[in-house]
Amino acid sequence: MRRVLLAGGGTAGHTSPLLATADALRRRHPSLEITCLGTPRGLETTLIPAAGYPLELVSPVPLSRALDADLLRTPGRLRASVRETLAVLDRVQPDVVVGFGGYVSVPAYLAARRRHLPLVVHEGNALAGIANKLGARLTRHVATSFPATRLPHAVLTGLPIRRMIATLDRPALRSEGRVAFGLDPDLPTLLVTGGSQGALRLNGSVSAAADALADAGVQVLHVIGPKGEVQVEQRPGGPPYVVERYVDRMDLAYAAADAVVCRAGSNTVTEVAGVGLPAVFVPLPIGNGEQALNARPVVDAGGGLLVADAAFTPEWVRAHVPALLGDPERLAAMARAAAGVMPLDGDERLADLVDLAAGEGVR
C-alpha cells in the first residue's frame, strides 16, 4: 500500500477518528501517502491541515430524512460531488479509500466503487448514519465502535482516538493537570465539557448551580465552547471555578478531574470511559437518539449516569453532583467499571482492516 484516501469531516465526531487512523497508518507505514477528503464547511478545514495532512475539498451532500426541498435537490448535488471526488481519486491514485461517515462520505463511497477501489467504512456511533448504511452495502470491510451497531459485515474495532488519550495515566498526571488549569491540588474536581462546539444546556445548568458546588468544596473546570457564555461569581476563598473556551490538552483536563459532565458523542464516550473517568452523560436531544445509545454500554456497566437533556436542570445538578463528587468510594467504583468498557486501540484495529482491504484488492 502506497497511498490512502481518508474521507470524513463536518464535526469532530468524524474528523477526530480520521486523524487518529491517519496517525496509526503513518506509524506503521512511514512512507505512506495519506490524503484526506472533506468539505469546505466542516472542522476538517482547520484540524486536518493543522495535523499535517493534505486535504482535498468537494461539495457536501446533506442527506435529508424529510420529504422537503433539500431531499429533491439531493440527486443533483450528489452527481456533482461524485464527479468532484472522481477527479480527486484520479489525481491521488489511492490504493484504498476509508470513509468515516458524514456529508463527504457518500460521494467518496460511490466514487471508490466506480473506480473499483477497495473501500473501508467506519461507523463511529452506536446507531449507524445514512451514509454508512449505504457504504456498508458496497464493501466487506466494515468497522464499528459499539457492539450493538447493526451493519452488514461489521467487525468491532472500537473508535480510533488520540494516542495521548489512549495512553493516559490519570493519577500520574493529576497534579500537572490541576496546576495547568490553576486548580487546587487537593479539592474534588468536576470537568464540564460540551465537546468541540460547547453545550448551552450544560453551560447554563452547571454554572447556575455553582453555589451548591462551592458549598460542597467542589472546584470546576468548565470548557464552554467557542460561543458559550457563563456568568459565575468567584467566591472569595472558595473553590476555583475555571472557565475555558477551548482546551487543547484534554489529557490534562481528564487527569485533573474526578468526574465529568458531558454530552455523549462517540469520541467523548470512548475517551472518558477509556481513561476511567466517571461521567454524567447528557445526550444531545436531536437525531435518532444515537448519543443515548452511545452512552448505554458505559452506564449499564456502572461507569456513568444518563440524564435526559430536559431533566438536566440546575436543581438536578444541586441535588446530585455535589454528593457524587463527595463520595470517593462511589467514584472509584465508577472509574473501575468505566475503564473496561471501550477498546482503546481502535486506531490500530482499524489500521489492520485498512491493510487487509488494500491487500485484497477491490472490495
Pin down the residues of each PLM region.
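Donor-nucleotide binding loops and adjacent catalytic segments primarily
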Residues: 42, 47-49, 170-179, 183-262, ...
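Conserved nucleotide-sugar phosphate-binding/catalytic loop shared by glycosyltransferases and other
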Residues: 2-12, 31-82, 310
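C-terminal alpha-helical cap of glycosyltransferases
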Residues: 343-363
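Conserved donor-binding/catalytic loop of nucleotide-activated donor transferases
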Residues: 115, 255-258, 273-282, 301
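Active-site-proximal region of nucleotide-activated glycan assembly enzymes
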Residues: 113-175
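Short amphipathic alpha-helix
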Residues: 14-26
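A short, well-ordered alpha-helix in the C-terminal region of glycosyltransferases
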Residues: 330-344
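Glycosyltransferases and closely related glycan-assembly transferases
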Residues: 84-97, 105-120, 133-137, 141
